[in-house]
Amino acid sequence: MVGLLVTMGFVNKQQDALLCTALNVSVNQDNDLYFLDKLDIIQMIKDRGDSIVGQPKSTVNVSEIEKSLNSHSNIANAEAYMSIDGEMKVEVTQRKPVVRVMNLDGDSYYIDSDGTFMPLSNKYTAKVLVASGMLSEPFIKRYTYSIADIGKDSLLNATSLLDEIYAMANYINADKFWSSQIQQIYINKDRDMEIVPMVGDQKIIFGDTTAMDEKFKKLLTFYQQGLNTTGWWDKYSIINLKFKNQIVCTKK
């Protein structure tokens, strides 16, 4: 037993003295996200003042490096660990924006798939839905919140439309047809959401997200009829989905 403990202690000392041989970084770029690449991650680690390669494994603070990376606004998750042969590995998953918000002051930011606010990037612009119109909330004030926080705060819930925008963006993005047909969500002066189609110049008034699935089904029926009727698209200037069990259209 004593011999075993001595051997284990010797092995542990050897491991502590082992030098870090390499820094291996991988960045998940699924969904064509290019906010960050491996060179960016390496630079973040260098900017912390951390020396990695050539240093004893025991002196490399892996947990602090991981914590620092996870605090970055474009990173959804980062995992850092040291292999038994002295290679430090860092695996990064980027945040996935679902909508870009543009407010009245020209301030702009993303909301990601988890409902977290994230800034724009000088390096990459995500091809996502745009939400604009009568929105005044600046990113600086919102960044400490998430969509979940809005639902918990009565004041935020009463004044913010971002949770409505987030819910609609998720619905559109999850549907192959609508994600190919809708390019923008617009908030009008009545605080109703309007959706801007890729094709056609109609104003489509959606209202809020109440009965959202039903409203999209009504709109789909309208689209299907329009596709099968010559001149249908040119008849109407406004399509209003706010009313239950009906579509109210205004002719041009």
Task: Give residue ranges: language-model regions.
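Charged, solvent-exposed interaction patches on well-folded alpha/beta domains
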Residues: M1-V27, R48-P56, V60-K67, S71-K252
